[in-house]
Amino acid sequence: MQSKTSEKETDSKGRTTAVEVFGILEVKTIHFVLIKTLYFCSMIHDPYTAKKVAELLIQINAIKLEPKNPFTWASGWKSPIYCDNRIALSYPTVRTFIREQFAKQIESLHGRADVIAGVATGAIGIGALVAEELNLPFVYVRPKAKGHGRKNQIEGLLESNRQVVVIEDLISTGKSSLDAIKALKEAGAEITGLMSIFDYNFSIAKKRFKKENINIHSLSDYDHLIELAIENRFILKSEAEVLRQWRAAPNKWKP
């Protein structure tokens, strides 16, 4: 067991404070590293908005939780949750709240962007609404270039060296987002950040975005959704554990 000692030091305001030392590693250093780690991992800018958005998405059935009767994704994964945020466009109050929160957080996190880009097809509608709220140009990015006409992958006018904030409706593995970002960069855009309505917080997505140095935030995410669902008794605590197990290894999970 390492010995514990106490030292004194003076802070920036001239106050004397005690610093506990374990061997050569100070507790204050451990605390600093922990805070930095938590900050890096956090993709939620406003916890209140995160819960509110999750609540709204559940109320309009954009998010469905079925731990006992799982859905099947296009990838073949079995999932106790299904999320279709495009439904929000059919509810004026909900889409207005989402649009306004996107605009506030974009201005807070990214300053003044030049262009808003939506990832097709799910984020075309909400992306255009956000661009309207911010009075900015809008473009959207297809998964791949069209095979006819002008053969565009990016629809709309995008000049070189524009500061672009990318909008997604939903982030799972991150592949579609990064494909869109790649196309935007190849067109000369500078990516300021990526924002989504909802993020599953899969580890594979975090690794991919970190590798590409993409600044990512979401209005809501899986963790806030589960917390809200438990608080409002939408699910039992035992079902919440099933949801957490699925998120930890969605490709291996079995109901």
Which residues are covered by each model-predicted region?
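Short, positively charged and aromatic/hydrophobic N-terminal segments
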Residues: 24, 31-34, 38-42
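PRPP-dependent phosphoribosyltransferase catalytic core
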Residues: 44-59, 182-255
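Conserved acidic residues
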Residues: 114, 162, 192
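Active-site-facing substrate-recognition patch
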Residues: 43-111
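Short, glycine/charge-rich flexible loops or terminal/linker lids adjacent to PRPP-binding catalytic cores
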Residues: 127-165, 173-179
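Short glycine-rich phosphate-binding loop at a beta-alpha junction
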Residues: 111-120, 195
